[in-house]
Amino acid sequence: MALTSWFMRIDRYCSVHAVRSQDTVTVNGADSSNSCGIASILMVNFKQKKHLMAAGLSAGAAISSSGVPGGTYIGGQLSKLAVEQAVKEEPEIYKIYTDVTGSIYNGSAYSDATNFPEVLRRLSLGTWSCDWVGPGGFFAAAKASTDKGIPVIGHVAWSGGGAHFVVIDEAHSSTISVCDPWDAELRIVPAAAGATINYDPNAWVWSFSLGGNRHQYGSPSPGSFSGWIVRKTA
């Protein structure tokens, strides 16, 4: 739980995305991290409460465009404070997650998405649901939510077995913006209504990171969005 777990990514649409890397858990020296679910919840909390947009870059951009001397510096400071506030909230979110699941969270167990709506509700983020929309219905469901400024949590099923949770916080006519907690990267993924959305994290990503807590994908592990989605309903 540190500032080094948060990364800011800028996409080709000039949008800024806050990506939180999942916690690293080792068992007998081996990486046993299965904390993508809680990391996705942390990202949704950050994005929904507008930590970055309301108190960070938007404010900084407004100050800069007004011609106030030092506007860029002020905007940067606000962005830093926004992330710091998100980090301060993490212990409470971990506690809520533990209370909802009934077991102490340590990041080594697989997440159950049916628990996510209650965790998000207890974070005062409204009413959420975990729904099956099918592989072909995922794009429309995700876009309907992100068009309102509300991110969703998507479930990726790996072709070789296993699964992964990611956050989608923006969608365009033929793409979705995927915030991946494993390597803290943002990926612009091709998508179309009625079609299964493939996800290949091994594809080349343009980004720049100075250190930080993040994982790297190893052998090729392509997959696709299964059709499960956690979204806000009220």
Question: Residue ranges of each PLM-predicted region?
Answer:
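Conserved active-site-adjacent core of cysteine acyl-enzyme catalytic domains
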Residues: 3-4, 8-10, 14-18, 67-233
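A short glycine/serine-rich beta->alpha loop
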Residues: 11-32
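Long non-globular sequence segments
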Residues: 18, 48-51
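Mature, Sec-exported extracytoplasmic domains of Gram-positive
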Residues: 28-29, 39, 43, 108
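N-terminal leader/capping segments at the start of a protein or of a new domain
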Residues: 32-37, 60
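N-terminal carbohydrate-binding/catalytic regions of secreted carbohydrate-active enzymes
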Residues: 35, 39-40, 44-46, 54
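Surface-exposed patches in mature extracellular/periplasmic domains of secreted proteins
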Residues: 51-60, 128-135
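Intrinsically disordered, low-complexity domain-flanking/linker segments in eukaryotic proteins
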Residues: 58, 63-69
